[in-house]
C-alpha cells in the first residue's frame, strides 16, 4: 500500500502564530496521529527479536538469530559468544546491540577490539546494522559519542583510562576475549573495573590451555557465578578436571556461554584440504641446526634450554631469525648474562654466514607459482617476514607484510592492496589476528605454532562464512627437525589440521592435557636422543588417541 505524503505549507506560519499567542495547543487530529506513531513504535512483548525488522540490506543466519534471542531473553545480556571461528560472532554481537538499542535498553556503548579490527568493526556495524559507531582516533570521542569502537590498548592508557572508567556503559563488547584469560594482566583489571550493565565476550577459544581460563572469563560477566577462586581451584583446577567431566560445572558455564559448531548450523561448508610440504635442509643449513642442537648436551639451565629450543625453531624458518635472536642476546649482555655464552654465539654466527640459501623459501616460491592465485603466508618471526617479502620480490612475486606493530591505517591499506593486485600477504601471528580474508583460499603455514588453537585461528581467516571455494592449507616442515616431530604429532597422528575448534576441544581441553605446549616443550627439552624423543611423542599420541575415545565422565580419571 502506497501512502501519499502531502506537505502543509501553512504549518510553519500557524506554528509561529501559536507560539506568539501561547496557543491553542490542543489538536485532536494531531493527537491521534501521534498516538498512531507511538503504537507503531511500541514493542508488543519482550519475546522475539525486533532487530531483524530494521535490517533492510542484511539477513542474519538462523543460528545467529538464535544466539541473539537467547542472550536477550535468557542471559540478561551477559554472555560469552564462543562460536567456532568463522561463524559470525560479530554479527551476533551486532544483533544483540541493535536489539537493546531498539528496546531503549542501551544507549552508551563501548566496543573494545584488537587495533587491527577497529575499522572492520565500525564498517560492519554501519553497513549491516545501520548503527552509527565511531572509531576512537586522536580526538577524544568517549563522552561526545554514544557508540565507540576502540582498541583495548588505547582505552586502558592514560588519559583515556580515567575518562572511560568514569562512564557508566549500558553495554560493553570485548572481541578476542581469550586475551583476558589471565586475571593478573592489566587488560583484565581494566575490563573488570568498567561500569557496565550488559557485557558480551567474543572468543572462539574460551579455553586454550587450562580450565582456570573459563573461570576468569565468567567472573568478568558474573562475579561469583562459579564460586570463589579458591573453591574453583580445589574443586576443578587442582583435580585437573575437564569441563565435560563435571556436569554441574558444565551447566553453570552454559548459563553464560553459547557455542555453536559448524555442524550445528546446517550450512554447506567448503572443504578443507591439507597438504604437508617436506623441506630438505641444504648442507650448510643442516650444519647450523646441528650446531644449535648440540648445545643441549652442555647446558642444563631451563632458560638456556628454552633459548636453544627457540633457536632450533628459528633455524627451520630462516637464518635471519636465528641471527636476530643471537644479536638480541649480545645486546642485552650488559643487563643480564646471555642464555648462551659469547664464544658459542660467535661460533653460531660463523655458521649463519656459511648459509647461502633458504630451502624452505625456495619451496614456497615454487608452490606460489604453482598455485597462481592469492596466498596468505603465516610466519612466527618478523625477521623471516621481512626476508620473505624481499625474496618473493626477487622472484617476481608481489607481496605485502601484515604485523601487529602496524598502525590501524597501514593495516587497512595492506588488506586493500592484498584484495587488489597483490598476490601474497605475509602475516605474523599478531598481525593476522581477527582479519577476514574470505576472498583468499590458499594458506601456507611457513612456521607452525605448537598450540593447535592458534593454528585454527589462522585457518579461520579464510575458512569462514562467505568463503565460496574449497580451502587449501600447506604445512611446511623441515625433515629431521623439531618441526617435523610436531607436524607428525599434530597432523599425521591425531589429524588436528582437519579438525575445527570444537573438535579440538574434544581432543585437547576435555582430555586433560592442561597445557599442550608445555608437554611438547618438556618432551623436547628432556630427550637425550632422537629415539627417546620419538618414543615420548608416540606415548603422547597414544594418550591423546585413547582419551578422546573415552566417555566424557571418564576422561578426567
Curated annotation (Swiss-Prot):
Domain Helicase ATP-binding: 70-224
Annotated GO MF terms: ATP binding; chromatin binding; DNA binding; helicase activity; hydrolase activity; nucleosome array spacer activity
Domain Helicase C-terminal: 363-524
Enzyme Commission number: 3.6.4.-
Cross-referenced Pfam families: Helicase_C, SNF2-rel_dom
Listed GO biological process terms: positive regulation of transcription by RNA polymerase II
Residue ranges of the motif DEAH box: 175-178
UniProt keyword list: ATP-binding, Helicase, Hydrolase, Nucleotide-binding
Gene3D superfamilies: P-loop containing nucleotide triphosphate hydrolases, Tandem AAA-ATPase domain
InterPro entries found in the cross-reference section: Helicase_ATP-bd, Helicase_C-like, P-loop_NTPase, SNF2-like_sf, SNF2/RAD54-like_C, SNF2_N
UniProt superkingdom: Bacteria
Enzyme class: hydrolase
SMART domains registered for this protein in UniProt: DEXDc, HELICc
Residue runs in coiled coils: none
Annotated positions binding ATP: 82-90
Record keyword ATP-binding present: yes
Family: Belongs to the SNF2/RAD54 helicase family.
Full protein name: Uncharacterized ATP-dependent helicase YqhH
Origin organism lineage: Bacteria, Bacillati, Bacillota, Bacilli, Bacillales
